[in-house]
């Protein structure tokens, strides 16, 4: 019997009525154990597609692409599925030998069936090939790519809002979110059944926890798509500022025209069945961040804009907005479990986090200091909007800020699309490619409507950072950790988690209130 048949023989048929999970933890003294038993019907496993779509989003397990044969989508999913069986053989075997009523948290066979229906393949098309685990350098690049994204552009604006001392909060947020990333790792290590953040939520709080965390993660991705539209619109308006258009008595200014144009540009990329090329292009985000930082420094030092001292030390009135932006800069916990699961040496995951967060903090602080020193109180929500257009470095930075969202938009929207398609009736008609195109188009148009209604890049980022990021990156990792490993934690560990939870609640409430107030003020100004 070949390897593929052996792997398939270990699969246990999923019970159609219910699914039971038993996750046990035994302390070092063997005196007591904490047992978590999750029992839900098949619908409790929504979303099943999350880990695969996030793998494509981050490129954590790069597929072997074959453009000539047109099989890159199949290979990508095959590699991702195969990794489920080859990550920890002994743990996987143990999860199957307990009893026939005890199934894995997510049935891999169900994943194969669902994914094959999404891409129009039979189960046999999704063969279990050799998984492509990431080396340590690849994992570091993936971590940096996830963390150091579009929020880099708005760091100087955050310093303007909070003052120079706000950078201390940025540093503290980096330490806290790096620590909560390690907490997620410890949760994943507690059971081989746990693969993703929603899995952790279910292990901690049942299906309710899985549902809440999944919705929050999808909301993060949706807001990122809105930010991509605003980002492209703002930078194109910077290049072509005086364009207006009148349609049936409706006057459109330059930002509105380019928001619509940007949506029309990214829409065909969302329709693609094969997103592997976009995934590879998006994986170069770390180099894009370096390029943007170098362009900013070049304009300040070589092109003669110069650096100036001054600025506020601390602005308590606007500090909550800065807090939200700083939180937005570290909102990568949605995919950290995928990076961990993709590593050849998962024991080095804490070092991956340390290097990734350290790199991001260095670049965030460097760009924040450089941008605010160059433009002072005139700094806009994206530093590319302040850079003089006559310089080559400025043009490179602006067009980079335009092109990058084009490669990321479809990847960010895909997990949401697959999650919604799971909720559709399981009929061939409702799972057709035409229905998928319709769902994708509606979602894209909805992001355009939101971007036109709230065209404020920094404020939307602050709102996302204050509300979503504090929940996903601060509060829930600690709550899940305390729940899953209760009875095994020291008082110090519990105290640290409680401190982080309280800090997250306070900063989240203050930042959300301030961001909403600023949003209302900007809308009133637009109306006037």
Swiss-Prot record:
State the source organism's domain of life. Answer: Eukaryota
Subcellular localization is given as:
Membrane
Q: How does it sit in the membrane?
A: Multi-pass membrane protein
The leader peptide range reads none
Membrane-crossing segments per the record: 139-159, 164-184, 211-231, 247-267, 280-300, 319-339, 349-369, 398-418, 442-462, 465-485, 496-516
Keyword annotations for this protein, in alphabetical order, are: Amino-acid transport, Membrane, Transmembrane, Transmembrane helix, Transport
The record's GO CC annotations read:
organelle membrane
Listed under GO biological process in this entry are: amino acid transport
Family recorded in the similarity comment: Belongs to the amino acid/polyamine transporter 2 family. Amino acid/auxin permease (AAAP) (TC 2.A.18.5) subfamily.
User: Under which name does UniProt file this protein?
Assistant: Amino acid transporter AVT1F
Lineage from the top down? Eukaryota, Viridiplantae, Streptophyta, Embryophyta, Tracheophyta
């Amino acid at each position: 019997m070949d390897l593929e048949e052996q792997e398939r023989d270990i699969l246990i048929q999923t019970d159609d009525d219910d699914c039971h999970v038993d996750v046990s933890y035994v302390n070092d003294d063997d005196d007591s154990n904490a047992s978590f038993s999750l029992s839900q019907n098949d619908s409790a496993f929504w979303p099943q597609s999350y880990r695969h779509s996030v793998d494509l989003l981050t490129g954590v397990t790069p597929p072997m692409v074959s453009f000539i044969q047109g099989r890159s989508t199949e290979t990508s999913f095959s590699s991702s599925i195969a990794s489920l069986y080859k990550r920890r053989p002994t743990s996987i075997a143990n999860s199957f030998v307990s009893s026939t009523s005890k199934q894995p948290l997510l049935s891999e066979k169900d994943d194969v069936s669902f994914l094959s229906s999404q891409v129009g393949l039979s189960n046999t098309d999704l063969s279990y090939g050799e998984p492509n685990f990431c080396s340590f350098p690849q994992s570091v690049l993936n971590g940096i790519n996830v963390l150091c994204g579009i929020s880099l552009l708005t760091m100087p604006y955050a310093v303007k809002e909070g003052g120079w001392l706000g950078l201390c909060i940025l540093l503290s947020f980096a330490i806290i979110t790096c620590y909560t990333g390690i907490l997620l790792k410890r949760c994943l290590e507690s059971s081989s059944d746990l693969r993703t953040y929603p899995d952790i939520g279910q292990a901690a709080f049942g299906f309710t926890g899985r549902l809440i965390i999944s919705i929050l993660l999808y909301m993060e991705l949706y807001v990122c798509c809105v930010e991509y539209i605003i980002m492209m619109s703002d930078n194109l308006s910077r290049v072509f500022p005086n364009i207006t258009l009148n349609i049936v008595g409706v006057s459109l200014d330059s930002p509105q025209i380019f928001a619509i144009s940007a949506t029309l540009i990214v829409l065909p990329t969302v329709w693609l069945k094969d997103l592997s090329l976009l995934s590879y292009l998006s994986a170069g985000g770390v180099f894009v961040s370096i390029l943007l930082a170098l362009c900013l420094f070049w304009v300040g030092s070589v092109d003669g804009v110069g650096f100036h001292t001054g600025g506020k030390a601390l602005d308590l009135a606007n500090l909550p907005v800065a807090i939200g932006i700083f939180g937005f800069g570290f909102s990568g916990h949605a995919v950290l479990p995928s990076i961990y699961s993709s590593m050849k040496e998962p024991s080095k995951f804490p070092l991956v986090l340390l290097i990734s967060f350290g790199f991001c903090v260095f670049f965030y602080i460097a760009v924040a200091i450089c941008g605010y020193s160059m433009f002072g109180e005139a700094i806009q929500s994206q530093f590319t909007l302040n850079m003089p257009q006559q310089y080559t470095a400025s043009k490179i930075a602006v067009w980079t800020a335009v092109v990058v969202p084009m490669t990321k938009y479809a990847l960010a929207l895909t997990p949401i699309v697959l999650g919604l398609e799971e909720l559709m009736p399981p009929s061939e008609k409702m799972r057709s490619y035409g229905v998928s195109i319709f769902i994708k188009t509606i979602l894209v148009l909805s992001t355009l409507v939101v971007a036109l209604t709230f065209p404020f890049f920094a404020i939307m980022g602050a709102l996302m950072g204050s509300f979503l990021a504090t929940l996903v990156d601060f509060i829930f990792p600690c709550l899940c950790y305390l729940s899953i490993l209760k009875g095994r934690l020291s008082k110090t560990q519990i105290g640290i988690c409680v401190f982080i939870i309280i800090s997250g609640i306070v900063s989240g409430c203050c930042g959300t209130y301030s961001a909403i107030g600023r949003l209302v003020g900007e809308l009133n100004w637009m109306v006037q």
